[in-house]
Amino acid sequence: MLCAQSLYANGFKIQEQSLNATALSSAYIAGARGADASYYNPANMGFENDWGENKSEFELATSLINIPGFNFDVATNNQVLYSKTTLQFNKNPVIDLGPLGKMDIEGLIKLGAGIFESLNDLFKPIILEHSTPDSQIVTGGTGDTALVVPKMFYKSRTMHGITFGGSFVASSGLAMQWAGKGGEFLQDVFIMMVEANPSVSYTINNRLSFGFGYRVMYAMGKFNNVVYVPLDKEGGGISLNQEQIINLAKHPEAVNALIPESIKNQIGPILNKLGTLSSSLIIPGCNTNGVECVNWGVLMGNVDGEKTNLFGTSKVYQKSEGKDLSTGFRLSASLRVFDNGMLSVVYNSPVKFDMAGKVEALTYVGGAMGNVLTTANLNIAVQMPEILALAYAQEVFDKRLRIEGVYERTFWSRGWKFNVTPDFENATYTGLSGLVALKDVFSSETLKQMVGIADFGVVSNMGAGWRDTNTFRLGLTYKSKNMRLMASTAYDAAPSPQDKVGIPDSDGYMVGAGAKFNLRGFDFGLAGSWTFKQSMSSLYHSGGLGGLFIYTASLGYRW
């Protein structure tokens, strides 16, 4: 696949928030100046901006995030689903055969087996196929995705070494609709994380500065997707007691749907041969091509118990949503090296979310069994990772050219990335069709037992196996009295495993460019950042390069 085009821009963080960061591929830490320093490096708010001023500043930026459409091929998780049912017959003589007296159902079957040997199959498990598997490779795709995201940045004038600032950004987000069998896993996804970040810095002698930012983040998400869940790995199965089976016998049309054709084709001829002796086992006035219709309800009434095991995977269509408010912090420090260099370090703490919400999961058992709707409370555990960045910027050619290099370590391996935990214990279970819709047979507790054999743990943690990553950024800024020109490149490693179905991604190679102009206290500009990804390193293949493109425009005012 085009690797979800960085689905969340390598993981689920989008670093390119301001115009400067977009143009510089986020190689903008030691060289951060002005209003957006409140977000990227609060310590630098205390230094003069690139126009040589100590002023209050406000900047409004708007980004267009574009993910080009793509098609892809991926291995499927959809296996065949079949059931194996074992019946325990009543030993009491409950069937009246007239002159032959009464006989239990097992005796009747053995009597018939003397004529039709294959009737012994009734003592064997009844095997029914509920679904067919997909081909090993399935195709998916999505159209172009475009998001418009506004952002704001502010810093005050520095007084007595103290500077205040703040920012409001969308630090993560995604809205995509995936089509086809291959796209079912992320069929309709919307994620939004917004961050308000008040900050303060203290600068000593225009040489050493410390900064602190308090991160207040709100996260929400809505997800409609399809997963294929393994069933009954422990072999526990589903059991009906005698009362439930007696109630099932009251629905002969439902029972009839459960009996394999091979057995139906043998019982009818036996009843024909028995004639009036089998009157209690036939439906009066009903025959097909001269063969009596069997009253399967009466037969099932003579079953003490049953056990059904399900094998393979069941299709589950999920609709879920969740939201949460959480906090973190940002620490930074900058040291001026001689007159033309700046060394900076920035630490972003992890921000943990427990997004509370609801989930509706429709489990497709299929066949005569039908489908079960589960409604439950839900918790989605997501952690924005901690990030440590080390940067150095050097100004040359009479401070007209700034060269900045950034090393960034993102600790993806710590904490949950996308762990979904439904409260199945206190959920509501409803049978929507087939046998499971018979409330006198399948109680809520039985439906709970049925859903309980599904191994949702296989698909509940889509961030499993993520690793810490390194990012390397290089930016160039040319400065004149009324203009700044910027260009950059970066390499951003993907945290997610490339050989698993989950949140897909692959390493990104970035380039950026932009310009900002100064006019009578105002500044305005345009910038672009282009991330390219090679799909062949991912489990999701499409060939060629994927892309994540960000275009940012800004307008600032200084006073």
Give residue ranges: language-model regions.
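Surface-exposed strand-loop-strand hairpins of Gram-negative outer-membrane beta-barrel proteins
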Residues: I29-R33, N66-T145
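N-terminal signal peptide c-region/cleavage motif recognized by signal peptidases
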Residues: A4-S6
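Outer-membrane beta-barrel pore proteins
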Residues: I29-G31, P42-W51, K155-T158, G173
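Outer-membrane beta-barrel porins/channels
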Residues: Y8-S25, G98-E129, V138, L147-W559
